[in-house]
Amino acid sequence: MISQFFILSSKGDPLIYKDFRGDSGGRDVAELFYRKLTGLPGGESPVVMYHDDRHFIHIRHSGLYLVATTSENVSPFSLLELLSRLATLLGDYCGSLNEGTISRNVALVYELLDEVLDYGYVQTTSTDMLRNFIQTEAAVSKPFSLFDLSSVGLFGAETQQNRVAPSSAASRPVLSSRSDQSQKNEVFLDVVERLSVLIASNGSLLKVDVQGEIRLKSFLPSSSEICIGLTEEFCVGKSELRGYGPGIRVDEVSFHSSVNLDEFESHRILHLQPPQGELTVMRYQLSDDLPSPLPFRLFPSVQWDQGSGRLQVYLKLRCDLPPKSQALNIHLHLPLPRGVVSLSQELSSPDQKAELGEGALHWDLPRVQGGSQLSGLFQMDVPGLQGPPSRGPSPSAPPLGLGPASLSFELPRHTCSGLQVRFLRLSFSACGNANPHKWVRHLSHSNAYVIRI
C-alpha cells in the first residue's frame, strides 16, 4: 500500500504527482524528497529513506526519479518491484520513458495510475490486461515508418540502410493508434552488457565484472511463440564445459518466469510466449575471467614541477577490440589537483575534444576503431601544486589530487562475454498473414571503468 506516487526530473521538477490516500503533506512531499536526496554527502542516494514518519522508496530511470511514499510498514522490496513494473508500463504505453514522453503523455500516465492502483493498493500491472481499459492514445514525437531510415545505424554505427532498423523503431508504444491500420508485427531483442573494471597504476587487472541482460520488446500478439537460440558453447559455472573450444562461460544466470527451459540444457534454446511490451528474458554475470582482452588500455605519463606549478599529462589510449569493431562516444574523466588555471592541449586527431570542468579534465572521442590508438598531451598551470604526503616530486609519484581516470563508452555489435544470439524464430500462425520483422542487437557499455594513475 502506498500513499503517494510522483515522478521528478533530474533537476527535481515534478512531472507527475498522485495522492492516493490523502494522509500525506501534499505536493510539498516531492520537494522534501528532492531536498533530502541532494543534501546527502558524496552524491549518495539510498533507495529507501525515512523522514517524518514517512518512508520514501525510489528508483532512477533515464534520469527520472520514480518515487513512492508510505506511512505503513510495507516491504521495501515489494515497492521497488512495483516501481520497476510501473517504469516498464510507462515505457510500453508511452513508447519510452524519459522527460519528454512523460510531458507529452500526462493524461495517459494519470489514467494508467488510476487503473494500476486503487486507494494505494495494486490492482494489476499487466500490459495486456490494462489495454482493455486505457482509452487515451500515446502522443509520440513523430510517427514511426520503416521507410524512415538514415545512414546511421543502431547505436550510431554506420551500415547499409536496408539492413538497419530506424532508431525510433523500438521506442514507440506497444499499442498502436486506433487510426493507424499499419501496425507492424515486430520484435526487438537486445543483448546488453555492463562492464566494470579496475586497473592498477602498473597496468595489472584488479577487478573485472560483466552484468548482462537479454531484453525483449514485443509488438506481436500475446499468443505468439518466440524461440531464441544462444551460442552453443554457452556454459554456466566453471565446472561445465561444452564442446572442444574454450567455451563462453558465465558464473550465474537467471530467467524470466515465462521462459521454457526444456531445450536449454541440450541445445541452448529458450522458448517463451511473451505479452506485448518489454521484459528481461535472461540475466547473467561473469567475474574475473573475460574470454577476450579488455576493450581499452590507458598508458599515462605524468611530469610535474612543484616550484613552477607546471603539470604535464600525456595519455595514450589503445583500443584492443578486433579491427572490424569500433567503440563510440568515448569519454575520459581525469580528476585534477585543485587550482588549475589554464590548459593547453595537443590531440592526435581533429575530431577529439578536451576541456576543463568541475575540477577534472574531460576528453571526448566520438569514435575509435579497433586496433588503433589515440593520444593527447595536456599541459596545465597549477599554483600551489603539491605532491603526496612525505614524498617530493618524482616521475613515479603523481601530484596530490590527480586521478584516477575513468572511461565511459559504447561497443555496438560486441559482447564482452562472447555471448551471441544464434537465431530468433517466431511462430507465424499467431501473426496472421503479416510477415513479422525481427531485430537482434548486441551492445556493451561501461559501468565503472577505472584506471589508477
Curated annotation (Swiss-Prot):
The keyword Cell membrane does not apply. Keywords: Endosome, Golgi apparatus, Membrane, Protein transport, Transport. Pfam families: Adap_comp_sub, Clat_adaptor_s. Residues 184-452 form the MHD domain. GO terms for molecular function: protein domain specific binding. It is a peripheral membrane protein. PROSITE patterns: CLAT_ADAPTOR_M_2 (PS00991), MHD (PS51072). Gene3D superfamilies: 3.30.450.60, Mu homology domain, subdomain B. High levels in the olfactory bulb, the cerebral cortex, the granule and Purkinje cell layers of the cerebellar cortex and the CA3 region of the hippocampus. Low levels found in molecular layer of cerebellum. It is found in: Golgi apparatus, trans-Golgi network membrane; Early endosome. Residues 383-403 are annotated as: Disordered. Adaptor protein complex 4 (AP-4) is a heterotetramer composed of two large adaptins (epsilon-type subunit AP4E1 and beta-type subunit AP4B1), a medium adaptin (mu-type subunit AP4M1) and a small adaptin (sigma-type AP4S1). Interacts with tyrosine-based sorting signals on the cytoplasmic tail of cargo proteins such as APP, ATG9A, LAMP2 and NAGPA. Interacts with the C-terminal domain of GRID2. Interacts with GRIA1 and GRIA2; the interaction is indirect via CACNG3. Component of the adaptor protein complex 4 (AP-4). Adaptor protein complexes are vesicle coat components involved both in vesicle formation and cargo selection. They control the vesicular transport of proteins in different trafficking pathways. AP-4 forms a non clathrin-associated coat on vesicles departing the trans-Golgi network (TGN) and may be involved in the targeting of proteins from the trans-Golgi network (TGN) to the endosomal-lysosomal system. This is AP-4 complex subunit mu-1. The lineage of its organism: Eukaryota, Metazoa, Chordata, Craniata, Vertebrata. The gene is Ap4m1.
